């Protein structure tokens, strides 16, 4: 697929989001924030608000990242292009589950997911400074029951550490998944259907 000529900025450090944008031929430049890990980003407060629904939470973070990216362009006098922001969050019985803070936390999260169905929500937002739009993908993922050894060995690979829910569907954790309903790319971290809708609404040809 020939890359589109217009560029965007991707306000994310995620290698999976970069891979998915390349998959559909989008030209982009990275626009990194300070910090970069959940809870450590000086530009984006990722603390859930009291009583905030998970759908609103994930949308708020994606919008905030895109809008913060536009401000960063102004501060740094960078060429003006639209900024794409995204956030992925898991929900299990009303509990928001983000990235693990350490190996013990990763193991605890995987024990929670074992043998159960959870939701994966990925919101994507696009902003050019004067207009901002967003879309959200919601999928369901069911894990088979996992034993302690499986969880310990998986955590030891290091794969869970930079991922919401402590697993990557495109990696070794694919062996844990009995069923998915929804968007595979949304579960990876960037729903391509919704992303294409946003790009086209801003006049980016695909």
UniProtKB/Swiss-Prot annotation:
Catalytic residues as annotated in Swiss-Prot or TrEMBL: 87
Key word Cytoplasm present: yes
UniProt EC number: 3.6.1.9
Main location group: cytoplasm
GO BP annotations listed: nucleotide metabolic process
Entry keyword Nucleotidyltransferase: no
GO molecular function: dTTP diphosphatase activity; UTP diphosphatase activity
HAMAP family per UniProt: Maf (MF_00528)
Task of the protein: Nucleoside triphosphate pyrophosphatase that hydrolyzes dTTP and UTP. May have a dual role in cell division arrest and in preventing the incorporation of modified nucleotides into cellular nucleic acids.
Protein family membership: Belongs to the Maf family. YhdE subfamily.
Protein name per its UniProtKB record: dTTP/UTP pyrophosphatase
């Amino acid at each position: 697929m020939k890359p589109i000529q217009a560029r965007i900025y991707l306000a994310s450090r995620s290698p999976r989001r970069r891979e998915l944008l390349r998959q559909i031929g989008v030209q982009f430049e990275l626009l990194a924030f300070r910090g970069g890990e959940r809870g450590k980003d000086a530009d984006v407060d990722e603390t859930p608000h009291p009583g905030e629904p998970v759908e609103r939470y994930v949308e708020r973070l994606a919008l905030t990242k895109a809008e913060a990216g536009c401000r960063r362009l102004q501060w740094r006098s960078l060429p003006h292009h639209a900024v794409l922001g995204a956030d992925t969050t898991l929900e299990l019985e009303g509990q928001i589950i983000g990235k693990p803070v350490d190996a013990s936390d990763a193991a605890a999260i995987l024990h929670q997911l074992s043998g159960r169905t959870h939701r994966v929500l990925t919101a994507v937002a696009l902003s050019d400074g004067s207009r901002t739009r967003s879309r959200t993908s919601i999928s369901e993922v069911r894990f088979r029951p996992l034993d302690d050894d499986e969880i310990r060995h998986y955590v030891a690979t290091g794969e869970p550490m930079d991922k919401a829910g402590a697993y990557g569907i495109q990696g070794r954790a694919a062996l844990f998944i009995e069923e998915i309903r929804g968007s595979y790319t949304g579960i990876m971290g960037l729903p391509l259907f919704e992303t294409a809708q946003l790009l086209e609404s801003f006049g980016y040809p695909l």
